[in-house]
């Protein structure tokens, strides 16, 4: 893979996933702040967690820093793509573990989980975490082809 093609792949992946994580983080923060103020906003996949939104925002910023490095023709741009993807995967793994623990509570018949459903625990964290596998795999391929 030539260096110009790699740069284009890094820029496009970092832009797409940077936008996904940043916009989701901002929406999550806004919903969380409104719920703190007493207004109830419900959107599918969003739970209104301000700190979770900040985590998504941080991952989005890491992707955007990778765009800046790639535009400047810095080979370290792959590192930003790789790092942001790993952090996004970590967020997704945590969301998956929460889903599993809630499912166990439901299966054991705990009272708090009597009305639990799979789609109630399907959050933006889980979706973005699973999507972060795509840039992770591509960054891994790029880093192995440059060595």
UniProtKB/Swiss-Prot annotation:
Keywords of the record, alphabetical order, are: Cell membrane, Membrane, Transmembrane, Transmembrane helix
* Top-level taxon: Archaea
Q: Which residues cross the membrane?
A: 13-33, 45-65, 80-100, 116-136
Is Acetylation a UniProt keyword of this protein? no
**One cellular component GO annotation, for this chain's record?**
plasma membrane
Where can this protein be found? Cell membrane
Question: How would you describe this protein's topology in the membrane?
Answer: Multi-pass membrane protein
What is the protein named? Uncharacterized protein MJ0565
Protein species of origin: Methanocaldococcus jannaschii (strain ATCC 43067 / DSM 2661 / JAL-1 / JCM 10045 / NBRC 100440)
């Amino acid at each position: 893979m030539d260096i110009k093609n790699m740069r284009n792949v890094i820029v496009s992946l970092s832009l797409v996933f940077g936008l996904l994580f940043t916009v989701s983080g901002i929406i999550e923060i806004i919903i969380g702040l409104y719920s703190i103020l007493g207004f109830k906003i419900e959107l599918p996949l969003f739970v209104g967690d301000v700190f979770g939104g900040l985590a998504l925002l941080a991952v989005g910023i890491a992707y955007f820093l990778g765009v800046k490095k790639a535009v400047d023709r810095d080979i370290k741009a792959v590192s930003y793509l790789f790092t942001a993807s790993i952090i996004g995967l970590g967020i997704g793994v945590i969301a998956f573990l929460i889903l599993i623990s809630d499912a166990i509570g439901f299966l054991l018949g705990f009272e708090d989980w009597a009305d639990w459903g799979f789609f109630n625990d399907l959050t933006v964290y889980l979706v973005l975490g699973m999507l972060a596998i795509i840039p992770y795999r591509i960054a891994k391929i790029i880093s192995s082809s440059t060595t």
